[in-house]
Amino acid sequence: MNRRDFIARGTTLAASSALAPAKLLSQAARADGCLGPAPAVQLYTVRDALGRDLRGALRSLREIGIVEAELYGLNGPENATLFGLPARDLKRAFDENGIRVPISHIGGDLMSSGAIADIARALGLEAVCVALPSEFSGTVDGRFAMVPAKGRAQLDGLAEKLNRVGREYRDRGLTFGYHNHHIEFTRVEGLVPYDYLMSNTDPDLVKIELDVGWLATAGVDPVAYLRRHAGRVIACHLKDYDPKIASDVPQRKLVPPGSGSIDFAAVLAAMRETQVPRGFIEVDVSDDALLDVRRGHTHLQMLKGCA
């Protein structure tokens, strides 16, 4: 399943006891000379390579230096993105390649929490994050598109749903988080939808996965948002933004860390300051995904001062 189908169909780790404490993760990182989160990738970046040869792609990621990954497209037993493998076999493939998978994205319809939780436990996940709520997805000229919020009433309903789903996952031993795009920063009725949603959801039930590339696309300072939501951000998506790329497709302007306009030294410093334990490299659209992961990894490792 590609992300367009995944999002269109229905369409992370500070204070929860279910997750490894940020302090311990930071100490582990310093043990190998690095200041910052362990090298990690959102697997959607390398979806084509995984589809061709799952184990080969995982070996390639491990050779680059990736030790953590985030899964995507987990919607329930009928369409989970498990690459044709039972959940336990997929976990074994990750384990054999020394890659931990603590988080997965889930579909925007926010259904099937029980079934998803069962799969998550089999995979050894600690958290799930909604990639894009169905309220913000639609079609334009017959093609998938992200659509802005319609108004306060819609946002009130979504906030209520996020709290309810967050409670359902908490009761099943999982942390629930919200992953942003740029569309939540399009004002409606004088409101910034993202800010309104975060103000009207329970921080204990709805954590934050902050996508710094989409924040930059929206003209928002990632460092300011990391500090604003200190203690609530469980992970970041680390992608860069290049406004000079000529494209009507916003995903095309999202590039590997170090290839755009974002100050990742400042982002990593803010992540350390606010104790965000995980950061996943992601490039939404890539002509050479593994090369982009390597480029982003090299840049971030340099900024983290790795030995």
Role assignments for model-derived ranges:
Residues G51, A80-F83, A87, F144, ...:
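Flexible, glycine- and charge-enriched loops at secondary-structure boundaries
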Residues E68, G177-H179, E209, F280-E282:
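Generic enzyme active-site microenvironment
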Residues Y44-V46, Y72-N75, I106-D109, P133-E135, ...:
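Active-site beta-loop-alpha junctions enriched in small/polar residues
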Residues R4-A40, L50-R62, L191, M198-K207, ...:
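Histidine-acidic metal/acid-base catalytic patches
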Residues G10-T12, S16, N75, I103-I208, ...:
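Active-site acidic/histidine proton-transfer and metal-coordination neighborhood
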Residues N2-A127, P133-S134, R152, K207, ...:
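N-terminal pre-domain/capping segments
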Residues F94-I99, R164, D171, P203, ...:
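Short, well-ordered coil/turn elements that cap or connect secondary structure elements
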Residues G56, F83-R88, G151, L155-L162, ...:
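Charged helix-capping and loop-helix junction motifs
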